[in-house]
């Protein structure tokens, strides 16, 4: 475990917060798609840590930026913490995204809070032109658009209600782009309905699709088996631990209905 001091903890969109922390010790190398496991405060400290996606890294300053959504008592307690408060954080954890050998172009597909870890993908490999396709519930729920725009070759947006970008689904934006652009890899994170639609869209195209799964976790290091997911293994299926074997998997090998 490591102590990290809060540098900033601010609301950046509807129910979305950005948390920047600086570690007391040297931050290990971070792979995009890895996560931080944060112990939450309280009169009686909450038993389970919360997994938060790593959004931005300043390695030279040992600083991580995490983005989280208000979902319950734990994240509400976290949102009340102020600059200078010390947190107990395990990071970086898990297996992140990887850039395939020879990849010259990429697409980034994110939905809601799932867009957060994809900023780290864009910033990790600036030499690879990447187009970003982001979907949100509404304009008020969108965040960090200027950061995504700076790091992307092109940024396309959609919302459920049409208040920002096009009204519709982010996978429709990707489908249209693929009529004119060839991508060597797709990086994705978002809600299950979005991932199912992405599976249908990409099946049979021969393009690798790496997905970061969002699951509640217990230990965060693979010991408790709380965060299992079903993954194709040859002609069979096996259960894998999202925290240790993932959170990044081959989307075409993940059973999203299980």
Positions of predicted regions on the chain:
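Ferredoxin-reductase
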Residues: 2-83
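Structural signal for conserved beta-strand scaffold positions within catalytic alpha/beta enzyme cores
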Residues: 8, 56, 157-159, 211, ...
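Short, charged beta-turn/beta-strand-edge "cap" motif at the junction between a beta-strand
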Residues: 41-45, 91-96, 233
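Local cysteine-cluster metal-coordination motifs and their immediate loop/turn environment
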Residues: 117, 192-193, 214-247
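Nucleotide-activated chemistry modules centered on ATP-dependent adenylation/adenylyltransferase
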Residues: 201, 221-222, 247-258
